[in-house]
Amino acid sequence: MKVKLICVGKLKERYLKDGISEYQKRLSRFCQFEMIELTDERTPDKASFADNQLIMSKEAQRIHKKIEERDFVIALAIEGKQFPSETFSELISGVTVKGYSTITFIIGGSLGLDSIIKKRANMLMSFGLLTLPHQLMRLVLTEQIYRAFMITQGSPYHK
């Protein structure tokens, strides 16, 4: 199984890189994990709605190029479904049973995701109504993916 994490923007903070690197190492027992960082568009200070739409559209084009036709795509969006960790674990296990070999998670940039990416997604997922920096969300999601595999294994990691 392959798990891809497509992210808009570059990870800058060392502590986030270290945390994600640790979970990538742990995940290597269960899957091939790949994090793909895409260039984000600069958003002007007083960007109009049209400016924001254009920025999201450009970012969506970059994202779309990294999605394979047979990927099961889960896009993170505030309006998405929320799951307890156990249900998330079942979801990941169920995707492979349905014949998908790659799960692709998408985290948009500071403006979110363009509707074309949300429409392509097999599922929209949310971590709640809180607003989190998208760079921090990478670490949180990577940990939850690891936790999902540990739950499937019956590991005491998830208590």
Swiss-Prot record:
It is found in: Cytoplasm. It comes from the Bacteria. Signal peptide: none annotated. Keywords: Cytoplasm, Methyltransferase, rRNA processing, S-adenosyl-L-methionine, Transferase. One of its GO terms (molecular function) is rRNA (pseudouridine-N3-)-methyltransferase activity. Its EC number is 2.1.1.177. GO terms for cellular component: cytoplasm. CDD domains: RlmH-like. It catalyses: pseudouridine(1915) in 23S rRNA + S-adenosyl-L-methionine = N(3)-methylpseudouridine(1915) in 23S rRNA + S-adenosyl-L-homocysteine + H(+). InterPro entries: Alpha/beta_knot_MTases, RlmH-like, tRNA_m1G_MTases_N. S-adenosyl-L-methionine binds at residues 76, 108, 127-132. Homodimer. Specifically methylates the pseudouridine at position 1915 (m3Psi1915) in 23S rRNA. Belongs to the RNA methyltransferase RlmH family. HAMAP family: 23SrRNA_methyltr_H (MF_00658). This is Ribosomal RNA large subunit methyltransferase H. The lineage of its organism: Bacteria, Bacillati, Bacillota, Bacilli, Lactobacillales. The gene is rlmH.
